[in-house]
């Protein structure tokens, strides 16, 4: 007996400070995060995405490209940090100290 695969719908998002790409995609399950990304077409639109460098997650929780997705999941592709958060805090603290 052949089992029917069921369809799931997931969202994929990639954001900049002033714009974002958000797409709902329907796929057969089981499927992985990497497959969702490849099927979405996002890599053609945003050529700076490198899956060897960019981290991914599901609903703000870190995940691996090989993790399976569930119906309703939001797959997020994260951009690399442009500044070190510790350095930014140091600069803010120094600015606050100068104002005081």
UniProtKB/Swiss-Prot annotation:
It holds the Pfam family Ub-RnfH. SUPFAM superfamilies: MoaD/ThiS. It comes from the Bacteria. PANTHER family: UPF0125 PROTEIN RATB (PTHR37483:SF1). Belongs to the UPF0125 (RnfH) family. This is UPF0125 protein HD_1828. It comes from Haemophilus ducreyi (strain 35000HP / ATCC 700724).
């Amino acid at each position: 007996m052949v089992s029917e695969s069921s369809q799931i719908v997931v969202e994929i998002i990639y954001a900049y400070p002033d714009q974002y790409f958000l797409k709902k995609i329907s796929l057969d399950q089981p499927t992985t995060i990497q497959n969702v990304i490849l099927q979405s077409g996002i890599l053609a639109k945003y050529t700076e995405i490198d899956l060897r460098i960019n981290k991914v997650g599901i609903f703000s929780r870190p995940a691996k490209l090989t993790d399976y997705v569930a119906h309703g999941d939001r797959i997020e592709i994260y951009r690399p940090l442009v500044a070190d958060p510790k350095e930014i805090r140091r600069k803010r603290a120094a600015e606050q100290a100068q104002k005081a």
